[in-house]
Amino acid sequence: MSEATSGAQVQEEQEPDSAAVPSVWKNRDFTKLWTGQTASLFAAQITELALPLVAVLALTATSQQVGLLTSVVKLPYLLVSLFAGVLVDRVRRRNILIATDLGRALILSVVPVLYWTDQLGISWLYVLGFFAGCGSVLFDVAGQAYLPRLVERDQLTRGNSALGASQSAATIGGPALGGVLVQWLTAPVAVLAGAVSYLVSAVTIWTIGHKEDRPTPSEAASPAGTLREVWAGLRFVFGNEPLRAMTIMASIFNLSFTALEVAFLQFMPRTLGLSPGEIGLVMAALGPGFLVGAAFAGRLPQRFGYGRTMLTTASVANLVMLGISTVHGGGFLSVATLMLINFLFASFGVANNVTVLSIRQTLTPDSLQGRVAATNRFVAMGIAPLGALIGGFLGAGVGLRSTVLITAIGLSSALVPLALSSLARIKYELPPQIQERP
């Protein structure tokens, strides 16, 4: 445990009046950040669909090439997340957001130019996709670290809830918008539309009036110094009980969920015999769930307390997935049951994410916000490929229904570190900040 404060000390507070918390929407700088991040999130979702379609439709790429392109775009989350955290903690975060937006806009605008001049090849997409992915990692980490500088402590949950709603809307609407753009304007032009959206984000964030203090000089400019800074972030996360519990919970969840997802997508057509249209309905139920969860996430801690909200939302989201293995056969009832499971998983899962993120930001000193966010991002994205392998091998070894059940049990086990930690006992007030060890 770190010296001084364990960030989740339990206090017996009375339920606060939620009306006493000023609306986050009255904060003009937050509104600009929300607008910019929303534009950036939509750009990322449009690009995530359009880049592979450029490979398929414009370059007639093979299935292996498309798979490699997808992996290359995601690879920076594993390779550069920890180092991105160091940079975010040593540079003004608003500047990073603007620079990564402009950088991704420039990178993506190269795609249609190369296509129109008959110079575009799959190798170009690999290179451009990788650097665009690096920009996304930096933007994500900087965005999480920047929010606590713009809003009051009591507004963090509402702010994260609003940003979570944008993430949900982009997840639902971004691919659909990207599909329409590809259909009407071709895939390379759809990529250009993503670049324009990044420009909108950069301009909006540039108008934020909040002035950040000059970052503290650091030894991180040298390779050895950078590694020491990375280690300091890892030590802070795993050396403090509440942050360690969050990270362990996230790693168990992501490992199990990725394995479950691999099995579930095979379970529906092969075991239940669902048609592509029925599978689409089941997966579409996630969208409304995301929006409902994000809409209510900001209010739940004021009504039920932070610890109870975290434990309850995580319990419902994870335990409901045990119901998948009980579904037999196709037909309306099976589809409706799976839609309900996905809806509940999405709504309670988003509410849990918002609450956990708000507490993590509150516990973390400003000088470590980037590295703590990056460590969590590294764990979440880094363990997913292992989960996919486990899901595939289990499905082949013990069958899809058994795999769905086993991985859902694994998902439920993510509740254990949360339930045993001091996080579950946090009442209505956000916990005090953990003091950084010298």
Regions found by a protein language model. Name each.
Residues M1-P438:
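Alpha-helical transmembrane-bundle signature of multi-pass membrane transport and export proteins
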